[in-house]
């Protein structure tokens, strides 16, 4: 496969470089290889960490799942299942003397199945502590959750549960089981958080889906939240891993207990936040999942960005969903991807989400997420795609799973003129179970295309940047080459429009 990939890249450079016509080397639909890719592991809400100390990749996810690999295409399961015999944690299920529940579940208790729920871990290396910090959540209902901290001496674990950091879903009768009054003071106004005896979940967050990261100055932060009151942000103390509670500033969306309000609220379907800082663009990028996570739930990945870590985070239109406009939340956020199918895929992809972003061994940015399929099941697998920076500073995803790193990774192409048959997928803003099938179009060297879609395009000289005009929308993106999941050589572009929709185009290349 490595030799084939290298030959394909050399062919692409020969046929497509220098602004030449691209249809001479195209692969017909009938001759395409087709496949159903299987990664061999099952991790929901995956986070990937490249650990330079061991030169390995570690992937952790919901239900105490974990995998490890020497590269991005071959992960092996290491941990699986919420049970004491799973050695991801050394002490998570230990019950303190005199107590009835393990400490991590002291507030949330057991779930409806009378078991324990452990969701969405995310790991960061803390240089101050010299420890790997795992932030994760325990939960028992759609609002009753605790954000927790565990530590380890290696990325592989085992992790030692340290403490509960934050809780949601409390009532007047249960708030004393949390640190709310310890943080906010004995005279804190509980009625701002509890109404008619119940937690105001449309206003305040569900304490799940934590994601730690470093800002441009090396300070540690954690974003978190799911549905409920939206996505929030708190700074972290590098000496302890604990949260730093800010001074309250209600006029600017800052709460003493829960921190900085970023996007969402009103119990709308926005969850799984992840923030990454890109020094090349000097932007912070906030990725979230919209919709319901089931195969037919319309799950999808959206993107916002900000010049400041605490926001405001906005989309291509300079907007974001909030407590006032949340009923139309699907209009906001650049859509990274949703349900789609290309002709080389035997089964359509559905409900991508639960994403995180990381820098690989090769220095490239990648996005990892769980992927469901149009096969009548709720089976899912992790997928890793390359991320690129557009000329105007948005991050866009490659259409296919990675097939290599470094010299064998997908790479940008400069000074080409797309021509021949291209398959276009337009990721629309609706939250739906509908699959966006690739539309066949013909590109010509005069800068136009026609077929199922008709429009125009320009490629900036001596650069990978492409601009596509389609249905009154301007898409800005990049051109790249690589290999699809079936092993076909491809030229593709990935772009985001000024209407927040994204556009993928794929040209299949004969070898």
Feature map (PLM): residue ranges:
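Generic low-complexity, intrinsically disordered sequence content enriched
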Residues: 5-6, 14-17, 76, 96
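Carbohydrate-active catalytic/glycan-binding domains of CAZyme proteins
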Residues: 23-511
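Sec-dependent N-terminal signal peptides
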Residues: 1-9
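Sec-dependent signal peptide cleavage junction
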Residues: 11-27
């Amino acid at each position: 496969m490595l030799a084939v990939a290298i030959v394909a890249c050399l062919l692409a450079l020969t046929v497509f470089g220098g602004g030449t016509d691209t249809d001479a080397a195209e692969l017909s639909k009938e001759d395409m290889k087709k496949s159903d890719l299987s990664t061999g592991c099952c991790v929901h809400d995956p986070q990937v960490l490249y650990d330079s100390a061991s030169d390995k990749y570690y992937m952790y996810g919901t239900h105490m799942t974990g995998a490890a690999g020497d590269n991005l295409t071959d992960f092996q399961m290491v941990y699986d299942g919420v049970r004491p015999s799973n050695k991801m944690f050394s002490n998570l299920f230990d019950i303190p003397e005199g107590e009835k529940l393990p400490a991590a579940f002291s507030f949330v208790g057991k779930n409806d199945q009378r078991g324990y729920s452990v969701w969405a871990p995310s790991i960061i290396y803390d240089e101050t502590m010299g420890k790997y910090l795992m932030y994760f959540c325990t939960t028992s209902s759609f609002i009753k959750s605790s954000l927790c901290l565990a530590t380890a001496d290696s990325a592989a674990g085992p992790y030692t549960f340290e403490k509960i950091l934050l809780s949601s879903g409390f009532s007047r009768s249960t708030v004393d089981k949390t640190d709310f009054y310890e943080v906010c003071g004995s005279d804190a106004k509980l009625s701002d958080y509890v109404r008619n005896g119940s937690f105001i979940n449309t206003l305040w967050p569900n304490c799940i889906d934590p994601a730690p990261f470093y800002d441009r100055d090396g300070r540690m932060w954690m974003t978190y939240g799911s549905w409920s009151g939206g996505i929030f942000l708190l700074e972290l103390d590098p000496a302890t891993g604990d949260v730093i509670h800010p001074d309250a500033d209600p006029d600017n969306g800052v709460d003493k207990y829960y921190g900085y309000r970023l996007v969402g609220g009103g119990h709308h379907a926005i969850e799984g936040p992840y923030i990454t800082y890109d020094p090349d663009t000097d932007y912070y990028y906030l990725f979230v999942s919209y919709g319901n996570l089931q195969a037919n739930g319309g799950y999808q990945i959206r993107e916002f960005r900000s010049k400041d870590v605490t926001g405001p985070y906005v989309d291509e239109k300079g907007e974001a969903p909030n407590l006032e406009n949340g009923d139309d939340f699907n209009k906001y956020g650049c859509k990274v991807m949703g349900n789609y199918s290309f002709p080389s895929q035997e089964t359509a992809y559905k409900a991508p989400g639960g994403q995180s972003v990381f820098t690989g061994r090769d220095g490239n940015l990648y996005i990892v997420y769980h992927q469901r399929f149009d096969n009548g099941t709720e089976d899912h697998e992790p997928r890793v795609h390359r991320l690129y920076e557009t000329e105007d500073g948005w991050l866009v995803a490659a259409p296919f799973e990675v097939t290599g790193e470094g010299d064998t990774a997908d790479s940008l192409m400069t000074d080409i003129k797309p021509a021949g048959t291209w398959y276009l997928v337009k990721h629309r803003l609706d939250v739906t179970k509908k699959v966006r099938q690739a539309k066949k179009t013909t590109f010509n060297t005069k800068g136009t295309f026609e077929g199922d879609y008709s429009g125009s395009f320009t490629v900036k000289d001596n650069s990978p940047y492409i601009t596509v005009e389609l249905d009154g929308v301007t898409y800005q993106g990049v051109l790249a080459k690589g290999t699809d999941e079936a092993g076909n050589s491809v030229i593709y572009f990935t772009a985001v429009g000024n209407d927040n929709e994204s556009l993928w185009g794929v040209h299949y290349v004969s070898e």
